[in-house]
Amino acid sequence: MKKHLLAAGILLAFASVCFAQPAAQATASPSPKPKPAMSKAQILKTLSAAEKKLWDAFKNKDPKPFKSGLAADAFAISENGIEKKEDTVKMIPTAPCEIKSYELSDWKLTMLSSSTALVTYKGKTDGTCAGKAIPTVWCSTIYANRGGKWLAVFHQETPTK
């Protein structure tokens, strides 16, 4: 029960950050013609490509895509607890994991607002971490469009049964 309350509290705090309105600019300036809104299919294509880039980076132990693809305030929830962006970036090159291949499937996109999206999918990995087979997992990542760039702000994985 405490875990559920903690998770709910974290998600509530996270939602307040994601949905916060930007402060008004002090001086009004003519704004360029706004870009047309992306379709849901375009957003899913963009975010699934971003997820694949991060999975490739994890496989190749390359922290650079995590530095550029995660928001500064990003965090993940894993069996180790809450991990901040800097924890993830530091862990990537030294993770005791060997991944031969992976497959991502069953993609679904839920728009939480015009600039916040939840992408869910299944991740199947042929590999090991600390000598144990990596389980197939259901993944969820929340992205926020900040300054025209989609950045991951939250990630979580749950092993399938």
Map each language-model feature to its residues.
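Long, low-complexity, proline- and polar/charged-enriched segments
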Residues: K3-L6, S113
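Positively charged n-region of N-terminal signal peptides that target proteins for export
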Residues: M1-H4, Q21
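A beta-strand edge to alpha-helix "cap/lid" segment located at domain peripheries
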Residues: Q21-S68, D73-K161
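Bacterial N-terminal signal peptides
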Residues: A7-V17
